[in-house]
Amino acid sequence: MQKYISEARLLLALAIPVILAQIAQTAMGFVDTVMAGGYSATDMAAVAIGTSIWLPAILFGHGLLLALTPVIAQLNGSGRRERIAHQVRQGFWLAGFVSVLIMLVLWNAGYIIRYMENIDPALADKAVGYLRALLWGAPGYLFFQVARNQCEGLAKTKPGMVMGFIGLLVNIPVNYIFIYGHFGMPELGGVGCGVATAAVYWVMFLAMVSYIKRARSMRDIRNEKGTAKPEPAVMKRLIQLGLPIALALFFEVTLFAVVALLVSPLGIVDVAGHQIALNFSSLMFVLPMSLAAAVTIRVGYRLGQGSTLDAQTAARTGLMVGVCMATLTAIFTVSLREQIALLYNDNPEVVTLAAHLMLLAAVYQISDSIQVIGSGILRGYKDTRSIFYITFTAYWVLGLPSGYILALTDLVVEPMGPAGFWIGFIIGLTSAAIMMMLRMRFLQRMPSAIILQRASR
């Protein structure tokens, strides 16, 4: 029992800074929305539309680079720290190539925006302008993620938290300057949010690099003789590990986007209630997501040390802590769902629907916690391909079709509206949780030599 308590302390010490970093990132998006809304409703809508395109694109790159964390954790655990610098350099090359692709997609996103039904031309122009300003921050964001993954792979999660809050503090005044046109800068409105956010990502990257160069704990790995050129074999391995994670993230983001589109014809009350419940549940999701990042680090480190039993302990402890957290957040959600809904909107119909949907959200919080931590465990074992298959099957084969049938058809019951989609979420996330656990058990029952061989690839 003592080993599980000790492991839980280590996991929480790693996870809490990740939680705070995620809060800072969420707060940046909130600040952008509020400050653009203070300029005009059109600018706020433009930022919202631009963000809905930016997020899937940048999260794809983010997911691809998450492969670095278990690779570095495993090298650190095995004492092969001299190989870490080379992996990081290849990570920067990969980030550079991916950022060019993302920038090309975002530059041409105007075709998607203007194709939207009944969109106001002025709104479309502002959304395109916002994206074309923001896209210059894509390399900065992805380079920052490489540096952050280096630190987190070495079990240093506090730097990411500090840089997140530095970014938030810089974002507010820079937003103000470019939205309203102060200190000789042009008045750009919502487009100014894109300029500010792009600048902030570069500031965060440069601050993180400055920290890494000065950190005594990384003195032995931060330098490499000469300039490392792209190495196809290393980059191919990073892509093999990262692409399934990137696609899984993409499937998750697009699932919720598709559901939002399917709910939109049902009316203002249904859309508002759905959005409130979704926004609150996404805030709760920060907890298991951060714990999953910590579990990846611990499992990768233990496998690097050659201890499959300690890796199992880290995995089981992560799941136990995650279930405890999810139980507490579910009780909190059920107990205060009406009061939470009132913070967003005071329309009685909207509050009633949002409170009902939050009840369904509370039901899936434990499943959601298990599946996201399960994903973190599999990343630690470098078994990322299974994450892709499980996510696709659970979300797009089971969750979305069942939600659509329950919400919009009478094949099973009378059309349930948004609640049907939320039952679909429960089905999808519970299926994902079950499949993640089955895959984890399958991996852990392999002979230790095979597990360690797979982890050292």
UniProtKB/Swiss-Prot annotation:
Q: Does the keyword Signal apply?
A: no
Q: What protein name does the entry list?
A: Multidrug resistance protein MdtK
Extract one GO BP annotation from the record.
Answer: xenobiotic transmembrane transport
Pfam families (alphabetical): MatE
Q: What is its main location?
A: membrane
Please indicate the ranges of residues that lie on the Extracellular side: 32-52, 114-126, 181-188, 264-275, 335-349, 408-417
The gene for this chain is mdtK
The protein's job, in short, is:
Multidrug efflux pump that functions probably as a Na(+)/drug antiporter.
